[in-house]
Amino acid sequence: SLRSAIKQVASGRFGVTAEYLVNADEIQIKIAQGAKPGEGGQLPGFKVNDVIAKTRHSIPGISLISPPPHHDIYSIEDLAQLIFDLKNVNPQAKISVKLVAESGVGTIAAGVAKAKADLIVISGAEGGTGASPASSIRYAGISPELGLLSLTQQTLVLNGLRGQVVLQVDGQLKTGRDIILMALMGAEEYGFATSALIVLGCVMMRKCHQNTCPVGVATQDEELRKRFHGRSEYLVNFFTFLAQEVREHLAEMGFTRMDDIIGRTDLIERKSVELKSVEHMSVEHKSEAHIPNPKHTLIDFTKMLARIDNSAAIRHVIDQDHGISTVKDVAIIDAARDAIEHEKEISLEYTIANTDRAIGAMLSGVIAKKQGARGLPEHTLNVKFKGSAGQSFGAFLVPGVNFKLEGEANDYLGKGL
């Protein structure tokens, strides 16, 4: 599997294996998408070529449909279990959860923080894929500002949870000023997608799902892909200029570090709107004058910009404790070192309790990191358990590892096989 800094775990789980998960610095659980919250996704069959089919463990030409919900997440406890599973497979990776800016997202974000996510993404309605339905792009979700500040940041600070998580935001961010504003509202990381695509040549035809992208950005058609002229240097330049603009804004404000302005809503000043008289203007000049709407003066931002004064952290200050240093896999990995390193056949036996969760996940991650997708030769590592297995027994197990359980198992048995 090619290595990416961030890899997603979406509802379809296509190609989500131990090898996929260990080759990442951050694993993102995508609960929803800003452009089309609650709708799932679909990759049409004519875009599923041999490479994509192999990567996603599917068949070329067959449509890949991701349902709206994750079928192993129906509560915060279920989400906590998935976060625990992923952290076991790749202990070095940060686990993030992507939410959409909408009414009630603050309460959900508080639950996600309690589920021990390292990072929470608030995705604004303005961004998203060109393959989304036009009605969803236009009407679903709310602005990232509302979702981030008045819902998520304030709720997390109020409940003393803000210091445990990193907040990331996305949704049509384009300039250094956008980054500064999002930082003042509480975000520590900032996502760019559409603007980065445009830098690489995207012309916003919104035909990503039709395989007919005229500039070769979002198509598997070999002839159309020849039209792609994007280069990595373009992205480097774009983000360099973006960082420079952020630095200039910080200097204007009298700060030297981004950390110093995270959550500082007291630094946000409302623009004074001067209402111009338009009676003397012609119709043509009125259309060009950009006259502000007088209703703007009636909007009260007091609650939105209020700072919660409860002595709680307003930015990330401490990492989550995932409690993975004491899992049973640590002992199994130590005992199975010859099998992992030298592929010697080994048999082990352990008692197990229902508090032993995600047995095999960390073991599989270690093997996948060393051996890749092929795992170990058949029947190399054989482990017998007696007792009542906890949740996610045998999750993401790699080839060559055989588990035998004498007893019963709980939810998510063999997840990700």
Task: List each language-model region with its residue ranges.
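Short coil/turn segments at secondary-structure junctions
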Residues: 63-70, 135-136, 226-230, 347, ...
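Mobile "lid/hinge" segments at catalytic clefts and subdomain interfaces of large enzymes
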Residues: 17, 21-60, 186-273, 288, ...
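Charge-rich, low-hydrophobicity low-complexity segments
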Residues: 294-417
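Active-site-facing alpha/beta catalytic cores
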Residues: 1-85, 89-96, 101-112
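Glycine-rich phosphate/ribose-binding loops and adjacent secondary-structure elements
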Residues: 1, 70-226, 356, 360-361, ...
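Terminal amphipathic helices with adjacent charged low-complexity linkers/tails
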Residues: 1-16, 22, 46-47, 98, ...
